[in-house]
């Protein structure tokens, strides 16, 4: 029986699951388990000092090392190092669900018809799935042909750009976001600083009231228009913090303008 199915399996387009890591020992194993259906699992580690590399190797992943150069550069190095042209990009805090796996398997059995595919992402936060606010459906282009696509971006919010048509998948992949509110606030602080530095380097400016107006609209959009109010305390918290993120990044840009700082160039 095994010999009978082997030719069929070999005719499928191979997929490389690609992850970048830096001290991800707590979350990595589950992410790796979720992509075991792929033909290769490649982990590009940026210099972890915990058990990340050991966990990846134990899971059967091919582990490569490259000193951390920032998210965009690291992701592109990982894509280039993969053995196969079709890439499934996953982070250590993300999981491919069984339903999404089945959809991807059916897609490649039929033959990939697009240069890449956007996949909806659902976050788990404060004890529940967040299907609302700006966090959902949060489509991410994570399945793509590297011959026609690459990661682009600056200090924050990198994404895949492809040359060709983009399809959409129906099933979500999971994002296990922050450990707690303190972790969330710490991430907001880091990312708003990076955003302000990048905006300053690009010559962007913010008026005195821009942060107030933009953050007010962010809360209305998240809590009312995108139905955060249906998600209880978690929906309110996400909406408030998304508004705070918007205000903080504008305030930090204003601060750079006042001090005359140019912003940081490298990631």
Segments (PLM) and residue ranges:
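Short, well-formed alpha-helical segments that are part of the catalytic scaffolds
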Residues: 19-37
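Acidic helix N-cap motif at the loop->helix transition within catalytic regions
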Residues: 29, 50-59, 99-100
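Catalytic-site signature of metal-activated, phosphate-bearing donor transferases
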Residues: 72-79, 85-86, 90, 97-260, ...
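Short, structured coil segments at secondary-structure junctions
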Residues: 37, 58-60, 139, 162
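A conserved acidic beta->alpha catalytic loop
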Residues: 34, 45-54, 91
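Cell-envelope/extracellular polymer assembly enzymes that use nucleotide-activated donors
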Residues: 14-16
